[in-house]
Swiss-Prot record:
Enzyme class: lyase
Classification via InterPro entries: Arg_succ_lyase_C, Argininosuccinate_lyase, Fumarase/histidase_N, Fumarate_lyase_fam, Fumarate_lyase_N, L-Aspartase-like
GO CC list: cytosol
Keywords: Amino-acid biosynthesis, Arginine biosynthesis, Cytoplasm, Lyase
Catalysis performed (reactions): 2-(N(omega)-L-arginino)succinate = fumarate + L-arginine
UniProt-listed GO biological process terms: arginine biosynthetic process via ornithine; L-arginine biosynthetic process
CDD domains documented for this protein: Argininosuccinate_lyase (cd01359)
Pfam family, one: Lyase_1
Xref: Gene3D superfamilies: Fumarase/aspartase (C-terminal domain) (1.10.40.30), Fumarase/aspartase (Central domain) (1.20.200.10), Fumarase/aspartase (N-terminal domain) (1.10.275.10)
Subcellular location: Cytoplasm
Record's protein name: Argininosuccinate lyase
Listed pathway(s): Amino-acid biosynthesis; L-arginine biosynthesis; L-arginine from L-ornithine and carbamoyl phosphate: step 3/3
Length: 481
């Protein structure tokens, strides 16, 4: 029976209502966190002389036993609503209500669940960062191997300018760097304690909120009790980060799908990430990239769902907030799985260097450098050079001739001239790449410098990650031993 109902509401509750309102199905994500929260709160109650040391020791010892048993071995009676009441009921079975019933002194499930969510989510955020660091390192390995692999870059999915495949990979590394920074920033806002806020107005008991903050390894406390129990912006922020990262990863999936097609044929996805057709024996379909792309798209929907649940809720706690959790955890696991899939596909991709080079040498990808050369060598305005090269491209297409066959004629018409060496250099795709040696450019030397810079950032990220993981492990060890 739900021990909460025997007073105000009575023991009768409809079974379909119990099943409809229980959160036990997804409370598995906060089970361990709830035990930690209980131990920290009980420890503080003893230190503040709110409950006796004897009772506190009994409660904590039993909580540790429950933790070792695991949630799956508890009586998950849906009439108990949630994991908080399941654990308290287990305590009461073993210790009696006069002892176990003291654990919840000065606390509400409102501040309890808010604390649990933060404890669980901070670990998941660090797990995500760890996967991103691994993927980024692997991508840098691919980039380094292809810093001189000529290919063509696209705008509007139309061939634009020559780059290297290594430079193209770095474009995704650069985006992931920002994703990592966002998650680290969000971690600091997750890792603050609402414990002690009570239902919404704190408590008349002499609690020490700073002590539970320290015991649980939080960086600080939420100082307004109403905000402490009702705020879920840390979840929205995390899910927004997840959605943004998902969008960045979906671009990689799109490139894997498009560039592995026969029409592009610049890369080949490893067999283990593809499938064949049930009817067409020749097919090699990029199924994993496609499914990952689709799963990543659902992250946007999960974010919007949570925002919609939260919109215009009255202050402070409302049971609506319970329905946020399944969307949060689904997003987290979808993202982690997707990161691993993208990492695997990028790490094992086969590159068709000849096809990449062939693409870079056609369709006028060197036109911009030819215009730039006219500006540098002839001293004309770029807009004039742009028009001259545009005319060259137009005539080349219409007359089905190479630019180098008509360039002297067009330049002479405009009272300009270029040496054959300058023309050849301007029209050479790899010379184009080497010329672009500014910060962020595709020149092999610059790509090599960028790889080194990103590796330094990864090292700093890893140190920061290890430090935060160590902080959490220390707090958990101190509470559970």
């Amino acid at each position: 029976m739900n021990i909460l109902r025997r007073g105000r509401l009575g023991s009768n509750v409809k079974e379909d209502v119990m099943k409809f309102t229980t959160s036990l199905e997804f409370d598995k994500e906060i089970f361990e966190s709830d035990i930690l929260c209980d131990i920290a709160h009980t420890t503080m109650l003893v230190e503040q002389n709110v409950i006796s040391e004897e009772n506190g020791k009994k409660i904590i010892a039993e909580l540790k036993k429950i933790a070792k048993r695991g949630m799956e071995n508890l009586d998950l009676d849906p009439s108990l609503d949630d994991i908080h009441m399941v654990i308290e009921s287990e305590l009461i079975k073993e210790l009696g209500e006069d002892v176990a019933g003291r654990m919840h002194t000065g606390r509400s499930r409102n501040d309890e669940v808010a604390t649990d969510l933060r404890l669980s989510l901070r670990k998941k955020v660090l797990e995500i960062i760890g996967h991103l660091i691994t993927m980024e390192k692997n991508m840098l390995t691919v980039s380094d191997a292809h810093k001189e692999t000529l290919t063509v870059g696209y705008t509007h999915l139309q061939q634009a300018q020559p780059v290297t495949f290594g430079h193209q990979i770095l474009s995704h590394v650069s985006a992931i760097e920002r994703d990592i920074s966002r998650f680290f920033d969000t971690y600091n806002r997750i890792n603050i304690s609402p414990l002690g806020c009570g239902a919404m107005a704190t408590t008349g008991f002499n609690l020490n909120r700073k002590r539970t903050k320290d015991l649980l390894g939080f960086y600080g406390i939420i100082e307004n009790s109403m905000d402490g129990v009702s705020s879920r912006d840390f979840i929205v922020e995390t899910m927004a980060n997840i959605s943004m990262l998902g969008t960045n990863l979906s671009k990689i999936c799109e490139e894997l799908v498009v560039f592995s097609s026969a029409e592009f044929n610049t890369i080949e996805i490893a067999n283990e990430y593809t499938s064949t057709s049930s009817i067409m024996p020749q097919k090699k379909n990029p199924d994993v990239a496609e499914i990952t792309r689709a799963k990543l798209s659902t992250l946007n929907g999960e974010l919007v769902t949570v925002l919609t649940i939260m919109k215009a809720l009255p202050n402070t706690y409302n049971r609506d907030l319970q329905e946020i959790s399944p969307h949060l955890w689904k997003s987290v696991y979808t993202l982690i799985d997707s990161i691993q899939m993208v990492d695997g596909m990028i790490s094992t991709v086969k590159v068709n260097k000849e096809r990449m080079k062939e693409n870079a040498e056609k369709n006028y990808s060197t036109a911009t450098e030819l215009a730039d050369t006219l500006v540098r060598e002839c001293g004309i305005a770029f807009r004039m050079a742009h028009g001259i090269v545009g005319e060259l491209v137009k005539r080349s297409i219409e007359e089905k001739v190479e630019i180098k066959e008509i360039i002297s004629e067009v330049l002479e018409k405009n009272n300009l001239s270029l040496s054959q060496e300058k023309i050849d250099t301007a029209l050479d795709p790899f010379e184009n790449v080497k010329l672009r040696n500014v910060i962020g450019g595709p020149a092999p030397e610059e790509v090599e410098r960028a790889i080194s810079s990103f590796n330094e950032k990864i090292s700093a990220h890893k140190d920061k990650l290890d430090e935060k993981i160590s902080e959490i492990k220390t707090a958990e060890k101190n509470l559970l031993e």
